[in-house]
Amino acid sequence: MKKFMNFFSSNEFLKMIMSTIYLPTPVNINYMWNFGSILGIFLMIQIISGFILSMHYCPNIDIAFWSITNIMKDMNSGWLFRLIHMNGASFYFLMMYIHISRNLFYCSYKLNNVWGIGIMILLMSMAAAFMGYVLPWGQMSYWGATVITNLLSAIPYIGDTIVLWIWGGFSINNATLNRFFSLHFILPLLILFMVILHLFALHLTGSSNPLGSNFNNYKISFHPYFSIKDLLGFYIILFIFMFINFQFPYHLGDPDNFKIANPMNTPTHIKPEWYFLFAYSILRAIPNKLGGVIGLVMSILILYIMIFYNNKMMNNKFNMLNKIYYWMFINNFILLTWLGKQLIEYPFTNINMLFTTTYFLYFFLNFYLSKLWDNLIWNSPLN
């Protein structure tokens, strides 16, 4: 036993792993801090299920749709792997949005490196999910890819050339499908690498907590206390996940994707998966094509502006103004998601413009509300 422990203490790689397991963690963190580890579980589920599906998938426009049918009908447990991978993407993004919203509420963006890497993971995940959505080669897959890739043509001077280069031709074709499959296969591995960097950056600074305090006296070992606590969260989320896979497997998808891609027949309403609807809604709210593309990209990149916040309050728990505004922002996000699947007609277009404006205003007005609250607290006669 002594030799075994000496081996652990002398091996640098194992020491690094053990330091991760026994990381000093604030004693008062709640279940909102569980979603990061749940995200790790879903990332591994996506990588493993995707690897198994890739053995039977054919990235060819003539047989891609039928290879999916073959996976569902003839491959042993293929239907289960496909449903897990398909609905796993929805759960992955749901957990990620909850994870980001918790960080916004508790001001975890003050851990600048952790926050910056996290936004990169979000962008890479969105790219991987978009390319994966094209692979089944259904109607919505084809037309979704056509619309989104065409947005690059809004870039002045070089836009059209970039679109042709991505397509590998004058329209979405076999070369496009092959490229998307290759990128969809490799991107999750790059995301996994970024997650490791994310964890390294987190372990350099330590986790935040609901009070925003940073006292080492109030920290305990992550294992076994919080590892056991995390397991309960895993069981609950995985139970809900498998329940949806077995009872409502196609509830989160689009019915148009059960039809094979037909370039001669445009769907009535082209829309992406539900987890991209908020960004798609912002894209549609701006009449100018280039402006819409900039709005789409900035809907994610604007999260980087949080790094420059220097409010004295370490979270919104005790900041009444910011707390109210935060929940207004969450409702705004949900309404943008709902508006993204509505038809482009009155009154949805007008409401869309309003909520797009308030979405971006949050990141600027929130800063001034924090400053106002800081001044009220720190300049109070009681201080």
Swiss-Prot record:
UniProt cross-references to InterPro entries, sorted A to Z: Cyt_b/b6_C (IPR005798), Cyt_b/b6_C_sf (IPR036150), Cyt_b/b6_N (IPR005797), Cytb/b6-like_sf (IPR027387), Cytochrome_b (IPR030689), Cytochrome_b_C_euk/bac (IPR048260), Cytochrome_b_N_euk/bac (IPR048259), Di-haem_cyt_TM (IPR016174)
Entry GO MF terms: metal ion binding; ubiquinol-cytochrome-c reductase activity
Membrane topology: Multi-pass membrane protein
Residues bound to heme b b562: H85, H184
Coiled-coil region list: none
Subcellular location: Mitochondrion inner membrane
Membrane-spanning parts: 35-55, 79-100, 115-135, 180-200, 228-248, 290-310, 321-341, 348-368
Top-level taxon: Eukaryota
Keyword list, A-Z: Electron transport, Heme, Iron, Membrane, Metal-binding, Mitochondrion, Mitochondrion inner membrane, Respiratory chain, Transmembrane, Transmembrane helix, Transport, Ubiquinone
Single biological process term from Gene Ontology: mitochondrial electron transport, ubiquinol to cytochrome c
GO CC list: mitochondrial inner membrane; respiratory chain complex III
Keyword Membrane attributed: yes
One Pfam family in the UniProt entry: Cytochrome_B
SUPFAM superfamilies: a domain/subunit of cytochrome bc1 complex (Ubiquinol-cytochrome c reductase) (SSF81648), Transmembrane di-heme cytochromes (SSF81342)
Chief place of localization: mitochondrion
Cofactor note: Binds 2 heme b groups non-covalently.
Keyword Electron transport: yes
Binding site for a ubiquinone: H203
Obligatory cofactor(s): heme b
Binding site for heme b b566: H99, H198
Other noteworthy facts: Heme 1 (or BL or b562) is low-potential and absorbs at about 562 nm, and heme 2 (or BH or b566) is high-potential and absorbs at about 566 nm.
Quaternary structure annotation from Swiss-Prot or TrEMBL: The main subunits of complex b-c1 are: cytochrome b, cytochrome c1 and the Rieske protein.
Protein family per UniProt: Belongs to the cytochrome b family.
Primary role: Component of the ubiquinol-cytochrome c reductase complex (complex III or cytochrome b-c1 complex) that is part of the mitochondrial respiratory chain. The b-c1 complex mediates electron transfer from ubiquinol to cytochrome c. Contributes to the generation of a proton gradient across the mitochondrial membrane that is then used for ATP synthesis.
Name used for this protein in its record: Cytochrome b
Species name: Apis mellifera ligustica (Common honeybee)
